Amino acid sequence: DMKHAQWQESDHARVEALLSGVPFFNEVARDDADQRALLLARTEIIEAGPGDRVIRAGEVESSLYFLLRGQLVVQGESADGAPSAVLYYVSPGEVFGTLSMLLGTARSATIRVADAAREAVMAKLEFTDFDRPDSPYTLATRLAFFHMLVHQIRWAVEVQRMQAPDQELVAALRKVPIFTGPRDSDEELAALKTQARELAQPAKGRKAPGRIPETLLAAS
């Protein structure tokens, strides 16, 4: 359903204009020209048309996506695989696929391009590029990446907590360690990785259609 954007290799200005709507890309581009070039080289631009499937429920993969243009719909699937009601709409600038990527679990919802959208354009990153010990990225870039993940998951879980108070969820969040060591260090990176995965565990286990930010939870 999705395809690689053939113009990615020839229209660099268009690529950079689209990515400028994503704070993570802006931060890396501002701080390190070499890392900016590496990130651009390792980012795949994906296109899909109206109704095309972007993520299928039940799939397991290690990719993270940013919607750059268009609109996506998050849907559950019935037992026969047919799409069910729309749970959430994904708008440009939003990230999706986070929780399954962190936990290595199956996607729990299907994401399609909205029928009313002319097209959807997305940026795809491989999580393992940032997570593995021999990452091609610098410590600063990896810190920015995991800070982004922790922020996104905390936001989603906080919205969930406020909309549907859950003492078990509150207790789980209190157990997530807060880093107090040296900033911009390997220790901080390790702590962020731990925080991201520990936040993802209660978030992934408490999905309820209609009241949780489905870009991170049902779609993840």
Tell where the protein language model's regions lie, with residue ranges:
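Cytosolic regulatory regions built on CNB/CRP/Popeye-like sensor folds
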Residues: 1-220
